[in-house]
């Protein structure tokens, strides 16, 4: 019998008519993850996750939700006392003034064989880490503490509602709190790539 070969995994982003993102996200057997991307929005924080499917027949829309084998709520490694999806990864990546990201992270719960055939998705906006609110500098502000005008702008920017919709404060807060524990309110999907075996 031949010797079993240990492989790493890689997701390769190729520019398309919809976005100019290119580069790789590489997953190693020891949990190391190398993110090397360009073509992102300069000086912007983008959410990044592993999604459950590698189905790109409908673009990034058919990649499913976050990879979540344990069936828990969305969270972050920054808050270890809270549950998190395995696919939440580092939640966010920060692009330089040239739209470039070069980051290294460690995700001990990401098993290479379990993510093959799934996808890495980059989102337009920032992941709120499942905290049901946002940070303004170092100060945390829950969605229930935001003004109605802030809430409307935040929700419309995430395509939850349209301008002119008659929505009250409670409806918006409930939607944002629900999505915070599901998607991190990360906004639309701007780029995706299937995770496959890496040659190296």
Residue ranges and their predicted role:
Residues 1-200:
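N-terminal leader/targeting pre-sequences
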């Amino acid at each position: 019998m031949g010797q079993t070969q240990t492989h790493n995994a890689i997701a390769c982003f190729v520019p398309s008519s919809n976005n100019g993102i290119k580069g790789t996200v590489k997953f190693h057997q020891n949990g190391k993850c190398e993110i090397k991307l360009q073509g992102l929005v300069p000086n912007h924080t983008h959410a990044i996750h592993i999604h459950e499917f590698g189905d790109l027949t409908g673009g990034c829309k058919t990649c499913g939700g976050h990879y979540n084998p344990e069936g828990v709520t969305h969270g972050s490694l920054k808050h270890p006392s809270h549950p998190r999806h395995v696919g939440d990864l580092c939640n966010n990546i920060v692009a330089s003034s040239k739209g470039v990201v070069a980051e290294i992270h460690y995700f001990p719960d990401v098993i290479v064989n379990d993510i093959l055939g799934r996808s890495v998705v980059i989102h337009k906006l920032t992941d709120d880490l499942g905290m049901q609110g946002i940070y303004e500098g170092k100060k945390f502000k829950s969605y229930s503490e935001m003004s109605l005008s802030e809430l409307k702008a935040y929700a419309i920017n995430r395509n939850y509602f349209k301008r002119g919709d008659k929505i009250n404060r409670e409806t918006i807060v409930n939607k944002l709190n629900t999505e915070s524990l599901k998607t991190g309110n990360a906004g639309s999907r701007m780029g995706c790539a299937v995770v496959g075996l890496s040659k190296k």
